[in-house]
């Protein structure tokens, strides 16, 4: 628990991608106070530029493919083309909806999100600009496959 200092938490997590937010959510379930530091958007590469947008685009391609092959199962349908503006709008809506849901969940769990680039400055502390966050239990490095 905190000791009265707003920048002291049980757990300080550097990175808010899939590993970081999963850790933060579980820690909050266990009653830990949690700060999560992110220089981009909560959800990381997977949600914003990787897994989720790719799967949304693949879903649109599968719909087009099924439409093109509909006659083979007795369904009369024609594929008149692919509207890439519409496909990208669909992808963006999927990402936006999931991001809103995730940020709402993080907020509802009382997790503090600190925007900025964090730097490990001690075994129990991370510096974000002029702000120093101290962890009483652990600092978790969840910066992805490589730091940038």
Feature roles, as predicted:
Residues 19-23:
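Short glycine/serine/threonine-rich phosphate/pyrophosphate-binding segments
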Residues 2-9, 26-32, 37-148:
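Glycine-rich flavin
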Residues 15-18, 39-40:
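Glycine-rich Rossmann-fold phosphate-binding loop(s) that bind the pyrophosphate
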């Amino acid at each position: 628990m905190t000791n009265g200092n707003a920048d002291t938490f049980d757990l300080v997590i550097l990175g808010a991608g899939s590993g970081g937010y999963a850790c933060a959510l579980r820690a909050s379930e266990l009653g830990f106070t949690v700060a999560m530091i992110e220089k981009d958007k909560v959800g990381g590469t997977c949600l914003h530029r990787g897994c989720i947008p790719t799967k949304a685009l693949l879903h649109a391609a599968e719909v087009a493919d099924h439409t093109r092959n509909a006659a083979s199962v007795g369904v009369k349908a024609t594929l008149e083309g692919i509207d890439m503006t519409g496909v990208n709008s669909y992808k963006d809506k999927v990402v936006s909806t999931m991001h809103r849901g995730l940020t709402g969940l993080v907020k509802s769990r009382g997790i503090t999100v600190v925007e900025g680039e964090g730097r490990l400055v001690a075994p129990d502390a991370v510096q974000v600009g002029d702000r120093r966050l101290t962890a009483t239990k652990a600092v978790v490095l969840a910066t992805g496959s490589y730091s940038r």
